[in-house]
Structures are given as structure tokens and as C-alpha cells.
Amino acid sequence: GANVVAVDLSPTLVQLARERKPYELGGGKLEFVSGDMLSTTYGRFDHVVAMDSMIHYERHDLVGCLAQLAERTGASMVFTFAPSNPVLAAMIKIGRLFPRGDRAPFIEPVSEAALRGVIAGHGGLAQWQVGRTEKISSGFYTSQAMELHS
């Protein structure tokens, strides 16, 4: 069984996750924490999964976060980003017409090619390679998962 640390900024979502956790996990351990996923207090990891954690970051900031995580990660990191496309760009422009309180949280569309370029050029990720990548689409939800492995 794996030892898992699940981190989210929202104490409300962390509490909800605790309530929904299965009672029997087998041989592993699951710890829910409200905080910053980039904090070094969580220790080292074999694998990191960051689902929709970085969709609000511009590509250089996103890669900076990955480099911070890479310092404490041994094997792989899987993360999602908002892939840029003309439909999403139009939706964001229309969304900006609404009052700020009525808008969904802002996402930062990122080109896969541009993201690959920033990853390849970042010294903190020199030992990491892009692995699998897959677009995820369900209804209005669209993201792209990317794997980095050392």
C-alpha cells in the first residue's frame, strides 16, 4: 500500500475528502492536509499527482512549481493544465465581460508546445523528460494531463 499525502488550499474540500474516505485502505496510509502543495514540510515523494492544481498559473510559473516539486520527487509527476484553443480563448474573453464576483475562477490557457519548451529550458528540470500526455474532455470541462519522469 502507498502512503499518500493529499493537499488542497481549501479546508472545506479537505474536510469533505476526510468524510468521504473509505474506512479500509489496505496496507497504506492516507493523510489529508489543508495547505500549500509546494511546502517542503510534506517530505519526499516517489510520485506526485497535481490535478487542476496549476491551471491558474502562467506557463513559466507552472514550470517553476514543477521544478520545486521535482527537488523532492524521485520518479514521476503528473499534472494537468488548461490547453489553449480558440474556443477557450473566446470563452475567457466573454467571461471577462461579467462582474468579477459572477465569474468562475480564472484559468490560464497554455500551449502544449510552449509548455514543453519551458520545461526543456528549465535547469531545475534538466533530469526530467516529458512522458505521456492526454487531453481530458467531459462536457464543459477540458484539461490536459502531462507526465514528467526522471
Regions found by a protein language model. Name each.
Residues 1-39:
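Class I SAM-dependent methyltransferase SAM/SAH-binding core
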Residues 53:
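Hydrophobic adenine-recognition pocket in adenosine-nucleotide-binding enzymes
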Residues 88-105:
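Short, glycine-/aromatic-enriched active-site segment of Class I SAM-dependent methyltransferases
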Residues 131-150:
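Core SAM-dependent methyltransferase catalytic element
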Residues 73-83:
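Conserved beta-strand signature within the Rossmann-like core of class I S-adenosyl-L-methionine
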Residues 105-125:
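Short alpha-helix
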Residues 49-50:
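A conserved beta-strand element that flanks and buttresses the S-adenosyl-L-methionine
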Residues 57-69:
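A short, conserved alpha-helix within the catalytic core of class I
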